A protein has these predicted regions:
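Sec-dependent bacterial lipoprotein signal peptides
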Residues: 1-15
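Domain-level marker for long, solvent-exposed, non-transmembrane regions
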Residues: 12-183
Length: 183
């Protein structure tokens, strides 16, 4: 009898349309990610060459070395590009009888200066994190004063017999500062 009563109760009701509320999936929002040692204060400006990088490894010292190496490589690339622009402008504007040999000598000198000056980079930010899987992430930001590069180049030029003949420090400095302002 219990079965019969349930059957009668369920079949005698009025037929109402069943309305289901289907939940819409929540709209995914963009999530801002704050990367350590990054942002405007860590970018190259008219006074400093700057670069930021991250190294990842199961060994903290290797993670740091990776980050430092990559940041130094970025600074070297930026310096080489900037100094090439400076020397091209300087040679074509101020050197008498511009020639490829002068440009080649300036570029060779630049490579030497950059290699030596990179040891003078300064760490302006360093953050170490440990990931859930036990790896280390090291974020670094390095800087090197543009004036240090300019002075090192000027000293090298003054010591080069061929380049020294036509070299005018104040004009070179002016071109260098103009190029640094173009960031």
């Amino acid at each position: 009898t219990a079965l019969l009563t349930i059957a009668v109760m369920t079949s005698c009701g009025s037929s109402k349309p069943v309305t289901q509320t289907v939940q819409q999936p929540a709209v995914q929002q963009d999530v801002e990610i704050n990367v350590p040692c990054s942002g405007p204060e860590f970018q190259t400006n008219k006074e400093y060459f700057r670069a930021s990088s991250m190294g990842l490894s199961t060994d903290m010292s290797i993670a740091k070395k990776k980050a430092m190496t990559e940041a130094r490589a970025e600074i070297a690339t930026a310096i080489n590009a900037k100094v090439k622009s400076v020397t091209d402008s300087y040679v074509s504007s101020y050197q008498q009888g511009e020639n490829d040999e002068s440009k080649s000598r300036y570029q060779s000198l630049t490579r030497t200066v950059v290699e030596q000056e990179l040891s003078g980079t300064r760490v302006i930010c360093e953050k170490t994190m440990k990931t859930p899987d036990g790896k280390y992430k090291v974020y670094v930001s390095l800087e090197l004063a543009g004036e240090e590069i300019m002075n090192a180049m000027a000293n090298r030029i003054k010591n080069d017999d061929k380049l020294r003949i036509d070299f005018e420090y104040e004009k070179f400095k002016k071109v260098f500062e103009e190029e640094m302002s173009k960031n």
